[in-house]
Regions:
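C-terminus-biased signal that marks the final domain/tail of proteins
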Residues: 1-225
């Protein structure tokens, strides 16, 4: 991985030694080489708050030599990210999130859903049109604020992420049971309503998180809980 032995190439994939959970897959998408020699929170480019991102351009020069920053799994220029969960005998789920995977959250969207949550709908904002009702812009607000004091704020964000994702992984079981044995039309209706409701709940939760972080970290001060 360090490029010291170019003959010993890394495999394209590896077989896990034990069964992995959906949550482990989610979290693998958030990696910045933490705990390895390439840990991007530890080198000089991370600054005073352990920021694992390097702004463009990616290359830089020192003493006449050109260097290049690594590109981690999680990256700031993310429009959306997802993990597909194929489930035997059950409707698949697209776990869908907006913006940087390391500081955003996945919500369940059933694959037989027939409508899109308004907060995620095409046309609700764009790269040149900010709108308060857009999940893309809300998640960007929180994430870009966190980049200023990443070591502290990312921990606050991660608490909300883990709580939501673990809750949803359990919550979908009740919806699965509710859809079992119903007609295709009835299943689609339940799946669509559920997917939209949860996306809206997440949007509301992230709006509260946005305000919480501003209150806690305003003007460079750290308020007690």
């Amino acid at each position: 991985a360090m490029g010291l032995n170019k003959e010993n190439r890394l495999p394209l994939w590896v077989k896990p030694v034990r069964k992995i959970s959906p949550k482990q897959v989610f979290d693998a998408m958030r990696d910045h080489y933490e705990g390895t020699p390439m840990d991007m929170t530890q080198d000089i480019g991370a600054g005073g708050h352990g920021l694992p991102y390097r702004w463009r351009p990616m290359n830089f020069e020192v003493d006449g030599k050109t260097y290049l920053n690594e590109r981690a799994t999680a990256t700031q220029q993310t429009g959306f990210w997802l993990c597909g969960q194929a489930r035997e005998g059950k409707t698949g789920i697209l776990w869908f999130g907006m913006d940087d995977a390391a500081t955003s959250c996945l919500t369940p969207i059933y694959c037989n859903t027939t409508a899109v949550p308004e907060c995620m709908a095409e046309g609700n904002g764009s790269m040149l049109d900010y709108t308060d009702s857009s999940a893309f812009w809300l998640f960007n607000r929180v994430t870009n604020f966190a980049y200023l004091r990443y070591d502290m704020m990312s921990a606050d964000i991660r608490k909300v992420v883990d709580y939501w994702e673990n809750a949803m992984l359990e919550n979908v079981k009740a919806t699965d049971a509710k859809m079992a044995g119903l007609s295709t039309k009835a299943q689609k209706k339940i799946a669509t309503e559920y997917s939209i409701d949860k996306a809206n709940e997440l949007f509301a939760s992230w709006s509260r998180l946005d305000k919480y972080l501003l209150l806690k970290y305003v003007d460079g001060n750290l308020k007690s809980e």
